[in-house]
Amino acid sequence: MKKLLSLVLSFALVCTLISGCGPKGGGGNSSNQPLDAAETTFGLTPLPERTTLTIGFFSGSAHSMPWYIADRMGFFDELNIDVEYESFIGGPAMMEASASWDICDVGAPGILNGMKNYDIQMLGLCDNEYNTALFVRPDSPQAADPTNPEIWKGIECILPTGTTLQYMFLSYLQSLGLSADDVTITNMDVTPALTAFNAGEGDALCVWNAVAYNAEDSGLVRITDVSELGINNVCGLAATKDAMENKSDLIDLAWMVYYLTWDWCQQSEDNMAQAVELYVESCEDEGVVSNESICQRALDILSLIHISEPTR
């Protein structure tokens, strides 16, 4: 537990220092001729030749949506970029498969794992994943008396290990004077974890993003989350060493489009409505249960920086 907590806190410190200083298709340019910078949505200069960007895509996550929105709105197409996706529902698997993508968005443990073991290079921050949450059943002892450490001892909690969900759960246990030794943790990705929990497995459940809102809407009780705990749960953009060395122009455009797309989403109610609609579409494509309400709530709390914001 101490090792995981210290790793995440170390990552948070790095991020503070940084701050201080298959294809989905989309609209856009129907011509084979590259546009001039003045003709593109964000005033960026298109690549001279058609190039493919492969994204490590976090299924159902709000911090992956700028990629999908940019793709579907044609922002990549007009820059002579085709987009392909390698989809994941957890950071560890994404890092293990890093040879299959160029750029990704992922939580702190994934970034740390990637930097340590896979030569992944961090590019910037993209969220604090406030909706990383712990749930129990409404008729459980934990729902009735959530701050009583005695009733947490010996429980089984279902979550994907090596992720921000484990970090959040261990932080909550620590606040009760407990540790991982006092419980049983069953490793399972979030989508099957919710299904298993609803089928009666386990005593507690940790899930994030659209899956967390789905759990809440189905009647499960939210005990705590990253926002309530007040812990640093930063997520980041990262690229592979190969992409940084051999596709630097592509990676530069990719991260700029990512941040500029989030700015675009917030420029008008119509833009945000399109973003929500595309979020729902993405979840449907990825097999993540969602609806307009879930996706709107997830985007409402997305703590993604504006590219125009001054650093502090």
How should these model regions be labeled?
Residues 245-308, 312:
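Secondary-structure end/capping motifs
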Residues 215:
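Short helix- or helix-capping micro-motifs
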Residues 233-240, 255-259:
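Active-site-proximal catalytic alpha-helix in oxidoreductases
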Residues 27, 110, 211, 243, ...:
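Flexible, active-site-proximal loop/turn residues at the rims of small-molecule/cofactor binding pockets
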Residues 91-97, 192-196, 211-212, 298:
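Short, hydrophobic alpha-helical packing/hinge segments within bilobed ligand-binding/sensory domains
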Residues 32-179, 184-187, 203-209, 222-226, ...:
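Short, glycine-/small- and polar/acidic-enriched structural segments
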Residues 1-52:
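Short, low-complexity disordered leader/linker segments with a strong preference
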Residues 133-135, 236-239, 243-244:
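Short glycine- and hydrophobic/aromatic-rich loop-to-beta-strand nucleating segment
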